[in-house]
Amino acid sequence: SLEFGSHVQTKRRMLTEIAATLAFSAIQNNDKIGVIFFSDRIEKFIPPKKGRKHILYIIRELLEFKPESNRTDVGCAVEYLTSVIKRRCTAFLLSDFIDDKDFRQPLTIANRKHDVVAVQVYDRRVAE
């Protein structure tokens, strides 16, 4: 569903721009950044690191990533985050949240350990 969007910008591109903005903000704060690519399963994990070179690698991966599935399971991604990231972090969950299973319980558990900020990207035309 991320390929849907207006003729000006797809949701995928919008998510990539948001992620890039957050990544460059992380550089300014000397923070680590990593990415979990997911569909209805974990497709790729880039562990958190610092540095401009790492951020550029992440952005390149964001631009080139093609999910194997067109389904979404946010709960799976949140559970994975909780299992692989041991130290408390701020995690931005970027998704359109369409076709998701109920992910409230995994999100509640993740929020006990991390500060999870959900960012929903949508296109008004989907609702029309």
Regions found by a protein language model. Give the residues of each.
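Exposed, interaction-prone extracellular/peripheral surfaces
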Residues: 1-128
